[in-house]
């Protein structure tokens, strides 16, 4: 199982962070020798820079206590190669935090979730002989700092019988020893000095993230690495306005081949890239002709819809191209005068012809009609005359037949 930790943790130098501020003095845990218990926490007085996680009333005897917000929770079944007394632990996490208090119900549930013989044991100074024998295997890890000593959260690979004994007693011992120490020591694996790192979180960040301790502990234990990607660290989300603008401008969104930018004057169906077709797009080639854009457009027909523009393009392609003039066409005054005289003569002749047509039609001469009205009346009159001519020809033919019959009768008599 791969190791993972809380998503928003940053490496911090060795510092003393009190867990709570006691209203009344409590009895300290029985002290042991330095050789048997190297985890005896150092007494650090409470100062104005303390970060109380809860009220003093919630830390009475018989009540459960939650782990601090800035602790690491590694997987239960992770194998550790440094269980000897001489080798120092090689921390794979970027940050190593120490824990002084732990809740017994939370530890019991966490051991059930692990589902194997190796569980997550809190190694604390033992108080009786039974606890010291059970947890003697976990007291060989050397100190991480020469100035501050604290109880370290270390995994255990003992059998199931010794795990149950050490876990139940060590949690109760941790509760009693935390009443005397009231501190949590955070140690950086890179350096044990007190020099602050450049990315060290401020005190306000600890105050903001210290309230939801139980939720953070449960998420760090039960979340998988895939689920932890949803929890974005605070430093990635709290950008300033200028930094976010630079980040967005440096990484522009990638547009797909199907996305086109449209200009303000063009209709929606026209892409800005007129010569680009959808043949190179990852769609079905058999359907590409339906969405293919026209190859070329003229500036005059740019705002015409696709169907009408296609029709105009086909029609105008049949018209031969007119040769362009080398210069503007100019006429001399004589040509202008002759053109005006010819235009006046033509209009006069047309007016006279329409007047003759109006006289030929059986219309009232006093009514004023337009040229369109005169032509319409003339067409109707011509059709009427044709029908009358056909009727007259039929009548004349019938009269001729009657005359022939009358002649034959007169000859026979």
Curated annotation (Swiss-Prot):
Its main location: nucleus. Residues 23-42, 86-103, 116-126, 150-197 have a biased composition (Low complexity). It is found in: Nucleus. The keyword Nucleus applies. InterPro entries: bHLH_dom, Esc1_bHLHzip, HLH_DNA-bd_sf. One of its GO terms (cellular component) is nucleus. Residues 334-385 form the bHLH domain. Efficient DNA binding requires dimerization with another bHLH protein. This is Protein esc1. It comes from Schizosaccharomyces pombe (strain 972 / ATCC 24843) (Fission yeast). The gene is esc1.
């Amino acid at each position: 199982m791969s190791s993972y930790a809380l998503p928003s943790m940053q490496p911090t130098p060795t510092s003393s962070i009190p867990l709570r501020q006691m209203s009344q003095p409590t009895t300290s845990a029985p002290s042991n020798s330095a050789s048997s218990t190297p985890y005896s926490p150092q007494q650090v007085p409470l100062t104005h820079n303390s970060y109380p996680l809860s009220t003093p009333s919630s830390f009475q005897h018989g009540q459960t206590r939650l782990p601090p917000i800035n602790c690491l929770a590694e997987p239960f079944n992770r194998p550790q190669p440094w269980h000897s007394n001489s080798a120092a632990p090689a921390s794979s996490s970027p940050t190593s935090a120490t824990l002084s208090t732990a809740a017994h119900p939370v530890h019991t549930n966490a051991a059930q979730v692990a589902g194997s013989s190796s569980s997550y044991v809190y190694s604390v100074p033992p108080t009786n002989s039974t606890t010291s024998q059970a947890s003697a295997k976990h007291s060989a890890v050397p100190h991480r700092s020469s100035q501050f000593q604290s109880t370290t959260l270390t995994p255990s690979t003992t059998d199931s019988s010794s795990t149950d004994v050490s876990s139940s007693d060590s949690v109760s011992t941790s509760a009693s020893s935390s009443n005397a120490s009231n501190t949590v020591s955070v140690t950086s694996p890179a350096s044990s000095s007190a020099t602050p790192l450049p990315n060290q979180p401020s005190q306000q960040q600890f105050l903001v993230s210290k309230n939801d301790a139980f939720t953070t502990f449960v998420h760090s234990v039960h979340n998988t690495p895939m689920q932890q990607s949803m929890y974005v660290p605070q430093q990635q989300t709290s950008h300033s306005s200028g930094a976010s603008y630079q980040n967005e401008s440096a990484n522009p969104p990638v547009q797909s081949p199907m996305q086109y930018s449209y200009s303000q004057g063009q209709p929606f169906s026209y892409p800005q890239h007129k010569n680009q077709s959808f043949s190179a797009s990852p769609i079905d080639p058999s359907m590409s002709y339906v969405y293919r854009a026209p190859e070329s457009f003229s500036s005059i027909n740019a705002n015409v819809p696709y169907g009408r523009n296609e029709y105009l393009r086909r029609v105008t392609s049949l018209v031969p191209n007119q040769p362009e003039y080398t210069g503007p066409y100019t006429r001399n005054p004589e040509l202008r005068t002759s053109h005006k005289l010819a235009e006046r003569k033509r209009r006069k002749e047309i007016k006279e012809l329409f007047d003759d047509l109006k006289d030929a039609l059986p219309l009232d001469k006093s009514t004023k009609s337009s040229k369109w009205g005169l032509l319409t009346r003339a067409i109707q009159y011509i059709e009427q005359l044709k029908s009358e001519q056909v009727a007259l020809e039929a009548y004349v033919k019938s009269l001729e037949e009657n005359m022939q019959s009358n002649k034959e009768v007169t000859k026979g008599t």
